[in-house]
Amino acid sequence: MLLGDRLTSPRGIVRSPEAQQQVDASTARLVLYEFRMCPFCIKARRAIKRLSLNIETRDAMRQETSRQELLAGGGNIQVPCLRITDDAGDTTWMYESADIIAYLQGRFA
């Protein structure tokens, strides 16, 4: 699964340096909690790559601190989960790959 993901990696959107810098500033407040081999996580990561987004990923299977953050903040150890922190510092935990992809496409496409 991971090999197929690497071999068929999607091309990203090409933006002007200024536009990409703006997108990077917006994605600095996003974190994707994942398991590396989860097919739904791979789907979310491919959408992130396709949209040329610089989103931090945390492996909730191998990193105990990430797993505890996910459980404490989101209430479930379910992946993928996108942690969204807004300008006011409020945090939303979004589960389900389809919802995550729709959110990212709506905001950054």
Label the predicted regions.
Residues 1-37, 42-109:
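GST-like domain detector, emphasizing the conserved glutathione-binding G-site
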